[in-house]
Regions:
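Active-site mouth loops of central-metabolism enzymes
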Residues: 43-46, 101-108, 173-180
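Conserved, mostly hydrophobic/aromatic
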Residues: 25, 33, 49, 68, ...
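Conserved functional loop/turn residues at catalytic and ligand-binding sites
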Residues: 29, 34, 122, 161, ...
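Short, acidic/polar
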Residues: 49-50, 109-117, 180-187
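Conserved SAM/AdoMet-binding glycine-rich loop
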Residues: 57-159
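Conserved C-terminal portion of the radical SAM core fold
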Residues: 125, 148-207
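Short microdomains enriched in Cys/His and/or Lys/Arg
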Residues: 45-62
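Canonical Radical SAM [4Fe-4S] cluster-binding loop centered on the CxxxCxxC motif
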Residues: 4-48
């Protein structure tokens, strides 16, 4: 298996088979995150991807769910995502769904019809690090989008039938702003249909 850089998956994907689709992050500007500061975004070459699929087929031929690693594999183009999804299904005929991390920014360049095609190919389970639904907090964290963007892009996922999950981060709004952040985030998330919302806490480390 080819794994480079930081490789991790959310706890709820513990039973999914993992494969590297990308490494690094396309953005690397979130103020609270240093996971990928020194790691440029890279797509795994198809040759590597297929070699890993062949290895998975040998040891876990009945795999039903595959988690693509990397900070945001959904940043890949529609064509690349679709090619890889169908390649997975060529190797793993019992695979039902493929999941991965995504940013709101990654959904913007995809039309609803493209999202439907990706869903038909088996992509169904986007972990989206929204962190907040409060505009002031999103700006402070330098997320690169606002609450309206979250609603607009996730409604596209709803229309396409793609399941998605939110991450909410406590402590991100700064001292004295937690209540405002929580209320505004709850109002925003209630307009959408995340399958679930996981909660993380901001932890500060010295540089």
């Amino acid at each position: 298996m080819h794994f480079t850089g930081r490789t991790w998956r959310p706890p709820y994907e513990a039973h999914s088979v993992i494969i590297q689709a990308t490494s690094g992050c396309t953005y690397r500007k979130c103020r609270f995150c240093n996971l990928y500061n020194h790691e440029c975004f890279r797509m795994s070459p198809m040759e590597e991807f297929e070699e890993d699929l062949a290895e998975i087929k040998t040891y876990q031929p009945n795999a039903r769910r595959i988690f693509w690693t990397g900070a945001n594999p959904f940043a890949m183009s529609y064509e690349n995502l679709r090619l890889r999804a169908w390649t997975v299904r060529d190797y793993l005929i019992k695979c039902q769904t493929m999941a991965m991390f995504s940013s709101i920014r990654d959904i913007k360049n995809k039309e609803v019809w493209q999202l439907r095609k990706l869903r038909a190919a088996g992509i169904n389970g986007l972990s989206i690090g929204t962190e907040s639904g409060d505009d002031q907090t999103l700006l402070l964290a330098n997320k690169g989008y606002n609450s309206d963007d979250i609603v607009e892009q996730c409604r596209k996922l709803d229309e396409a039938g793609i399941e998605y999950y939110f991450v909410y981060m406590t402590g991100l709004a700064g001292k004295g702003n937690g209540y405002r952040n929580a209320v505004n985030s709850a109002r925003l998330f209630s307009q959408l249909n995340p399958y679930f919302i996981s909660v993380d806490s901001l932890t500060l480390f010295p540089d």
